[in-house]
């Protein structure tokens, strides 16, 4: 499933790219409870009533967490609705306050979930051949890119250089 190709942000990508971005956007992590991103999306499509009750929508704002009555930074989709009424609608406000930004971020996450449930989030390649699929090597390259945690590697390299620089400075000062 990871290698299947879809259209995402107006380009052809492996399904893994779309799924990883979806899970990353919702949870702040590239996977959820040991499940691959593809398993999360597949599970949501097959069992939406179960996934609506999973606490996977990351809400960074403590103020919004309190407003929603959350005990953790993760909300369930059902936490954001009272029946069919969207709870954030009454608090929706355009503006630059931290709460307004947190509400907008959460609203974007809810929008992605609703698009997935309505079938508009995943766009397969057209059967008529009007869109050129990726080559096998391009798919492998994208999957490799998705699997490497670049920010973690960059942090570790910078930390190592910083430590080496400090030790070199310390060595020079003690001479």
Task: Name each region found by the language model.
Residues 150-174:
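Selective detector of the "anchor" transmembrane alpha-helix that sits immediately C-terminal
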């Amino acid at each position: 499933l990871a290698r299947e190709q879809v259209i995402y942000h107006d380009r052809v990508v492996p399904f893994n790219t779309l799924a990883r971005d979806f899970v990353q956007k919702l949870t702040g992590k590239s996977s959820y409870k040991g499940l691959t991103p593809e398993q999360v999306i597949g599970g949501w499509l097959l069992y939406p009533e179960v996934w609506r009750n999973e606490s996977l929508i990351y809400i960074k704002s403590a103020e919004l967490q309190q407003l929603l009555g959350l005990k953790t930074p993760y909300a369930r989709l059902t936490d954001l609705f009272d029946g069919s009424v969207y709870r954030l609608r009454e608090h929706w406000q355009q503006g630059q306050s931290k709460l307004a930004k947190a509400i907008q971020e959460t609203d974007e996450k809810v929008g992605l979930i609703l698009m997935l449930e309505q079938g508009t989030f995943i766009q397969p390649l057209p059967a008529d051949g009007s869109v050129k699929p990726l080559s096998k090597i391009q798919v492998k390259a994208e999957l490799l890119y998705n699997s490497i945690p670049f920010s973690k590697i960059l942090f570790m390299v910078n930390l190592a250089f910083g430590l080496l620089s400090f030790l070199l400075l310390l060595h020079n000062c003690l001479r």
